[in-house]
Amino acid sequence: MKKILMILVSVLVIGCLVFIWKDELFGKKVDNNSSNLNDVKKDNVSIELFGKYYDAASKIMKDMTLEEKIGQLFLVRYDKNLASSWVSDYYPGGFVMFAKDFANQTKDSIKEEIDNLQSISKIPLVIAVDEEGGYVTRVSRYSNFRDSKFLSPREYYDTGGEELLEKTEKEKATLLLSTGINLNLAPVADVSVNSNDFINNRTFNRDARDTAVLIGKMVNYANEVGISSSLKHFPGYGNNVDTHTGVAIDERSYENFLENDYLPFKEGIKNRVPTVLVSHNIINCIDSRYPATLSKKVIAELREKLNFSGVVITDDLSMDAVNGYVEDGSAAVLAVNSGDDLIITSDFVKMYREVYQAVTDKKIDIKTIDQAVKRNIAWKIAYNM
């Protein structure tokens, strides 16, 4: 039994939760065939994802230092040579791995590498990849992991319908779990029907309503296998440019988001997606000052308009798109104060120290840290990480 469960066994009632978590979260298949697209648009029912695990998370947090809590806020770009020391010294919430990390590896070797890290971490680590399929594949591009790389969900759906989509998505989830990966940063919930859009080849290339139904199915497939998924890139990419290399300013109306972009996110949330990843686009109709991932107003949309109670993840704060939008201080500090729970970063130690200093200087309320950490740990318990 994993380390966090060993901690929980000693706590009254918590052990009971450990035995029933799968039935509660994944045992009941959602009948997506009954999805009414008007309901997708109008449904505003709040679903509390991890509330039953908050007491367990709070008990664990009582024994955590401030340093450990701050570390839990970060999903760190993986570096094999530094990962062990980071776990020992800075207590990260987890790592995000990229294609280079799977080169010259096998299923067994990467599993052993991840297991070794898990064994020295007090709190189980999130191990994430972007294995969307098609244009973005980190794992299946290598023949040691799969004979051929996964195609995009769109390609599978276009050629084999829902049956093939379900088969390949569940195969993907099973493969990732077998290697020690517990979070797939997918599916792409963006709406695009224009082949010239930067994001188009990663989408279903369908209108908002059809995309919403398919996204709901994708979330359900992942949940049935038991891997965490993540809707991206909230609040919707549209026809914007690549934010890995520059900022994208979205001039669309608020009504456009309500009537289109929000629909797939709403359906994913209705199907109990545990995490949502926020983009670096500037959404002028919501917040013309900050990229979405650093915007308290955008995060409020996700929490209050879409009633999302799960983990909010930033896109990588080391991307060019956020540079220049933080005049004084740190992008990580702004992200925490904006309501993000988990910060993806390629500059971990620097951002960790900035957040620690901000708490010391009372620029971040410790209650804000505690709220995010409690949600992150409750998520880890719920998904048996």
What residue spans do the PLM features occupy?
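Alpha-helix-loop-beta-strand connector modules within alpha/beta enzyme cores
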Residues: 117-127, 206-227, 292-313
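Mid-to-C-terminal alpha-helical segments outside catalytic/metal-binding sites
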Residues: 360-385
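Short, well-ordered coil/turn segments that N-cap beta-strands
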Residues: 71-72, 93, 122-127, 181-182, ...
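N-terminal hydrophobic targeting/anchoring segments and the immediately downstream early-domain regions
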Residues: 3-127, 131-141
